[in-house]
Amino acid sequence: PLCWFNRQPSSSATGELDKDALNFNGNTYYVGFDANQGAELQGQMVLDYIKKNADTIDRNGDGVIGYVLAIGDIGHNDSIARTRGVRSALGTGVDADGGVDSTPAGTNVDGKAKVVQDATLDVDGKTYTIRELASQEMKNSAGATWDAATAGNAIGTWTASFGDQIDVVVSNNDGMGMSMFNAWAKDNKVP
């Protein structure tokens, strides 16, 4: 038997399921969860939180709800799905090859990055712009991805660049998210 555990066999470029690997023989199994379903839930939870707290979440009152995104591994199907899920739910996703682009945006202070777009959200008669201010793969100097320490450093860089424009912090996994929360978001009361 062949057992794929916690990572679906997938293309490192697109994140699409490798059906040949998954169906290698009659005793091939995948043990894990549906990455796309989890991604949709994550994106919807972020959107629901923004809608519920729209009157207080825009910290500087500029009408732009800015978020930063810690991307785990640009070639990992879970990371690709989670990035796409958040961008789809928030309306900031841009189509690339029939799916939402999961490429890191780098910095996007003016909303003109090619891999994301500004979105609008109407809540109780008020229109907000939703903007992905920055995103990057959390890869350390040794090449390890999903790196919590790199995420903690990234939030420091992002806050120095964007300050009170950051209204929401989003992460592809809990370790990176906790690092950003402990390094900055908790003290600044940013979800």
What spans do the regions from the language model cover?
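A residue-level marker of the well-folded mature domains of exported/periplasmic proteins
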Residues: 1-191
